[in-house]
Amino acid sequence: MSPRITLNDGNSIPQVGLGVWQTPAEDTERAVAAALQAGYRHIDTAAAYRNETETGRAIANSGVPREDIFLVTKLWNSDQGYDATLAAFDASVQRLGVDYLDLYLIHWPVPENNKFVDTFKAFAHLRDQGRIRSIGVSNFEPEHLTTLIEETGIVPAVNQIELHPLLPQQELRDVHAKLGIATEAWSPLGQGSLLADPVITGIAEQHGKTPAQVLIRWHIQLGNIVIPKSVNPERIASNFDVFDFELSGQDITSIASLETGKRLGPDPRTFNFTG
């Protein structure tokens, strides 16, 4: 089983989960079922992924009790604002076929719209009603976090950000540590760009592990929550087989040399897409 990270609200989240970003709806149900069978208990989806229905169906048919699964989804940009958020939440849980979420995230800050504070107030209302266990954000930069906390008085439990050895986000992780926010990594494998890197493949050979397992282990040892994605049942199981080895200090130093500081995804400060 995955180790768990205790969040600032007292809830705990499995450190390794399955992400279903860019997973076609027709593949999602099979992938989530394979993950739950392999021992995963943390599933991460989003309204924008258009696969909440299939995610929920796999959970319902898995035989795993709902209370044993940490289920995460995200509010899309066009649904920000207090009332719109309440409606979007209802739509998400209906698609998922559940009556509560373990974690709900604001997908992007969309700073141009300036609605993320009211959105988070709606999240807090839903949490107070018992419909969400933990509330958090995704792709928030330090200035967005500062505004959110100052305006609402609530520190998000999680900030899910692009994070991999090319973009280790040390500065933002330091901010999280000071504020008590858990760091969660999306694109944890660098969208596959690191799997053939000689540094990673060399470390993998030394440990008798795959490059993906080395990268996931790197996240675990940094304290990140990590949600690798795959639709291949064997790879899904392999990505979860990361708890029986440890990277050395030299391994960590070698991986640090890969940093470029370049994003593979959009810049949250300028990404204002609401389509």
Curated annotation (Swiss-Prot):
Keyword DNA-binding listed: no
Active site per the UniProt annotation: Y49
GO molecular function (one): aldo-keto reductase (NADPH) activity
EC code: 1.1.1.-
Domain of life according to the entry: Bacteria
KW Ubl conjugation (keyword) present: yes
Cross-link (Isoglutamyl lysine isopeptide (Lys-Gln) (interchain with Q-Cter in protein Pup)): K262
Keywords: Isopeptide bond, NADP, Oxidoreductase, Ubl conjugation
Residues engaged in binding NADPH: L189, I227, K229, S230, V231, R235, S238, N239
Pfam family, any one: Aldo_ket_red
Family of this protein: Belongs to the aldo/keto reductase family.
Protein's recorded name: Aldo-keto reductase MSMEG_2408/MSMEI_2347
Naturally occurring in which organism (per UniProt): Mycolicibacterium smegmatis (strain ATCC 700084 / mc(2)155) (Mycobacterium smegmatis)
Record lineage: Bacteria, Bacillati, Actinomycetota, Actinomycetes, Mycobacteriales
